[in-house]
């Protein structure tokens, strides 16, 4: 029969093993989230540029406005 000290040591080693596995899992999740965030930042920059182009294209000078055709 293991002594109290041996039982405690076995319990601590078991907890450490589980915590190490959890840290590895969380590290993988964080790395995946980092990749997702980087991809989303690129998409936002692209969309912001496209929106800016649309806004600049819709704001023309008054000379560019043609009068509507009359029937």
Swiss-Prot record:
It comes from the Bacteria. This is Protein SlyX homolog. InterPro entries: SlyX. Belongs to the SlyX family. It comes from Rhodospirillum rubrum (strain ATCC 11170 / ATH 1.1.1 / DSM 467 / LMG 4362 / NCIMB 8255 / S1). HAMAP family: SlyX.
């Amino acid at each position: 029969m293991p002594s109290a000290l041996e039982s405690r040591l076995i319990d601590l080693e078991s907890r450490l093993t589980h915590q190490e596995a959890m840290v590895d899992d969380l590290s993988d999740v964080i790395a995946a989230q980092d990749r997702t965030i980087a991809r989303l930042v690129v998409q936002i920059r692209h969309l912001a540029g496209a929106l800016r182009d649309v806004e600049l294209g819709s704001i023309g000078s008054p000379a560019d406005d043609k009068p509507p055709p009359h029937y």
